[in-house]
Regions:
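Short aromatic-glycine-(Arg/Gly/Cys) micro-motifs in beta-strand/loop hairpins
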Residues: 21-48
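A short, charged, amphipathic alpha-helix used as a generic interaction element across diverse proteins
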Residues: 54-68
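Short hydrophobic/aromatic patches at helix-to-coil boundaries
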Residues: 70-75
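The feature represents the first ordered module of a protein
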Residues: 1-22, 41
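Alpha-helix boundary/capping detector
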Residues: 10-11, 32-35, 57
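Short low-complexity stretches enriched in small and charged residues
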Residues: 1, 25-29, 63
């Protein structure tokens, strides 16, 4: 799901606490947005590829901008 879809689902209350985890295929962090929706739960770029954040604080910043108050981080 991309940023626009994330914002809409957040406003509708359809998202759980986001989970940030270390990217499986190298350096960086990915965001999983589970909830009551049928979209791909991984945060994506506008072109549909999985968005990999180089820095953890960048991922957290985007989620705070959407409006999340709580974020879970796992390794």
């Amino acid at each position: 799901m991309n940023i626009k879809e994330t914002e809409l689902l957040f406003q509708a209350g359809a998202l759980d606490v986001p989970i940030i985890k270390k990217h499986d295929q190298g350096d960086g962090w990915t965001v999983t947005l589970n909830g009551t929706h049928k979209l791909n739960p991984l945060f994506e770029t506008a072109r549909g590829q999985i968005r990999v954040f180089k820095r953890l604080d960048a991922a957290v910043g985007v989620l705070f901008e959407v409006g999340f108050k709580e974020i879970k981080t796992v390794q």
